Each structure stands twice: as structure tokens, then as C-alpha cells.
């Protein structure tokens, strides 16, 4: 809870869940990384979409001033951050807008239902909001972590008017069978607050599909190394890399970037980071290095409660 410091002195390196099975640490050089020490995430107090009128637009405000500007259609390429996640040298997650990549196209909740199969992971997205993840369990319903409780909802209700998509292919772990994914999700319906083992909807949904404890609170021990890397694509030829002690920490930073949006992330990096010379033989990617001691800022849109590990 809070700023607790974990006692690791009695553990050997072999007890660390993500240790290299060969026993060889390929990352012995100096490392710069970030690690969250606060305890709760985000989306349950996220700003809600404005009420919609019968034509899908906003309701009139009844004032005498000019009507508010019409909201622009949601475009993932404008609002979302293209990024990859690595555990050591293995890519375990990738969000790419490369030509021919249709997986990030979004659909209305009604159209999304036609694309879902039991066991699918669904992501609802909207500008300036945290992505909300859910597990489709069939019969037009999803199971998701919402307001510190795992609940079963109709997909259209869980969307809260946001567009969505199936995101089975973002994480590159081997998935469980569809029936096992549905079983995992349904088994935790009703769990809430201190019974929870996940900080956010993404970690819960991903755990249901892949069954990896790295998605759980405290699923990995922090031993001072940063084996996880979040590579943010700045442009076609430049990227910036942040390193993390755990997948849990990395997901929180990735979700913060999704919430503030691509333009804000690029502006933040331009303001706080300084370009470094590309390494020899690595001319296609310019790397940037965070100033010493710069952790990612916690989001102002945190949950109003805590989830704890068991």
C-alpha cells in the first residue's frame, strides 16, 4: 500500500519470477528506468462522454451563445501513441499504425458485437480518456473491472458510448483457450476493492486471456533491474525508450500516455528529454534519455480507492 518498501533481502535471484532461465543477465550495463511507487490507477473517475442527442450529437445547452463545435470523429492515428513493449530482447506487445494494419480500427458498440467471439479482449477508446478493457463472454455481454469491482455488463453498456475494437493481437503472449478465458473472467465477477489483484481493466482482461501473474499487483519482485522497455515511436525514424522494473509499472505509464494523447506525449518528451546521438549501426532510430531522477508523473485521474495484492 502506498509507499511501502518491499523487503527482498531474504530472496535469492532464482526466486524472481522473470529471471532469465539461462542464469545469464545480458543487461549488466548502467540502466535508466522508472518505477511507480503509488498504488492505484486511473479510469474509474475518468471523464464521462457528454450525453448524446437522438442524432448522435451533443444535447443543446439552451443558451444564447453560438453552438459548441461538433466533436471530431475519433482517429487512432491522431490520438494514440504508437509503441512497443519488450521484456529483455523479446517483443511482448506492439501497437503499430503501419500500412495494412487494420487491427486498430474502431467500431460503434453495435457493430463491434458482430465481430466479437467468447474469449476476445475488447478495448473501448475515446479522446482524453483511459482505454477501458473487457472480456467478451458471449450473449452480448462482457466482464470487466470497473470502479474497483469486476462486473458483468452488456457490451453496449460497458462502452459508455465509446467506440471499440477487438485487441487479441496487441499482446504477443500465447493465449489460453477461449473457454478458459471466459472461465477466468466469470470466476471473478463480484470481486471488489481489497479482493482485487489488478490495478486496472487492461491488467485484469489481459490476465484472463493469458494467465500470467505479471499482470497482477505484486506479480513481480522489484530488485533494482529494469528488464521491461517501453519504446515510444516519435516519428518514422525516431523513438524514445523508458525502462521499468515490472510489467505492472509499464502498463500504468502506457495507459497514462493513452489518456493524455499523442500530441501531449510528444510535447512532454520534447520539453523534458534531450536527443542523444544514435548508436553506430543504429541510424534509423534516434534515442532519447530521460534526465536523472525523472519518474513518470502519476495521473491526476486516479481511482478513489486502492486495490491490494494478496
UniProtKB/Swiss-Prot annotation:
Superkingdom of origin organism:
Eukaryota
- Tissue/organ expression: Expressed in esophageal squamous cell carcinomas.
Compositional bias of type Acidic residues: which residue ranges? 300-310
Residue numbers spanned by region Disordered: 1-76, 274-310
Q: Which Gene3D superfamilies match?
A: endopeptidase domain like (from Nostoc punctiforme) (3.90.1720.10)
Ranges annotated as biased composition (Gly residues): 54-64
Q: Which residues form the LRAT domain?
A: 122-217
* InterPro entries on file: LRAT_dom, LRATD1_LRATD2
Q: Which GO terms describe its cellular component?
A: cytoplasm; plasma membrane
For bias kind Pro residues, which ranges apply? 65-74, 289-298
Q: PANTHER family annotated for this entry?
A: PROTEIN FAM84B-RELATED (PTHR46341), PROTEIN LRATD2 (PTHR46341:SF2)
Similarity remark: Belongs to the LRATD family.
Q: What is this protein called?
A: Protein LRATD2
Give the organism's phylogenetic lineage.
Eukaryota, Metazoa, Chordata, Craniata, Vertebrata
Name of the coding gene: LRATD2
Amino acid at each position: 500500500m502506498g509507499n511501502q518498501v518491499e523487503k527482498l533481502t531474504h530472496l535469492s535471484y532464482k526466486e524472481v519470477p522473470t529471471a532469465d532461465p539461462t542464469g545469464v543477465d545480458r543487461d549488466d550495463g548502467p540502466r535508466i528506468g522508472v518505477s511507480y511507487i503509488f498504488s492505484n490507477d486511473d479510469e474509474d473517475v475518468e471523464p464521462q462522454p457528454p450525453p448524446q442527442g437522438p442524432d448522435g450529437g451533443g444535447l443543446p445547452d439552451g443558451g444564447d451563445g453560438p453552438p459548441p463545435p461538433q466533436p471530431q470523429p475519433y482517429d487512432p492515428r491522431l490520438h494514440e501513441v504508437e509503441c512497443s513493449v519488450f521484456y529483455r530482447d523479446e517483443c511482448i506487445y506492439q501497437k503499430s499504425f503501419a500500412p495494412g494494419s487494420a487491427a486498430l480500427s474502431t467500431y460503434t458498440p453495435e457493430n463491434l458485437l458482430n465481430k466479437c467471439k467468447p474469449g476476445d479482449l475488447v478495448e473501448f477508446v475515446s479522446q482524453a480518456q483511459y482505454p477501458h478493457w473487457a472480456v467478451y463472454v458471449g450473449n452480448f455481454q462482457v466482464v470487466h473491472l470497473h470502479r474497483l469491482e469486476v462486473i458483468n455488463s452488456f457490451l453496449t453498456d460497458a462502452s459508455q458510448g465509446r467506440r471499440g475494437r477487438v485487441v487479441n493481437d496487441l499482446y504477443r503472449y500465447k493465449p489460453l483457450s477461449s473457454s478458459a478465458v471466459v472461465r477466468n473472467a466469470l470466476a471473478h465477477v463480484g470481486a471488489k476493492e481489497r479482493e482485487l489483484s489488478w490495478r486496472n481493466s487492461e491488467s485484469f482482461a489481459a490476465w484472463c486471456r493469458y494467465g500470467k501473474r505479471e499482470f497482477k499487483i505484486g506479480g513481480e519482485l522489484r530488485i533494482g533491474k529494469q528488464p521491461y522497455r517501453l519504446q515510444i515511436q516519435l516519428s518514422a525514424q525516431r523513438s524514445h525508450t523508458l525502462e521499468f522494473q515490472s510489467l505492472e509499472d509499464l502498463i500504468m505509464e502506457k495507459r497514462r500516455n493513452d489518456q493524455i494523447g499523442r500530441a501531449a506525449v510528444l510535447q512532454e518528451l520534447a520539453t523534458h528529454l534531450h536527443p542523444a546521438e544514435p548508436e553506430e549501426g543504429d541510424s534509423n532510430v534516434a534515442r532519447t534519455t530521460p534526465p536523472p531522477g525523472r519518474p513518470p508523473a502519476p495521473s491526476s485521474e486516479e481511482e478513489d480507492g486502492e486495490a491490494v495484492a494478496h
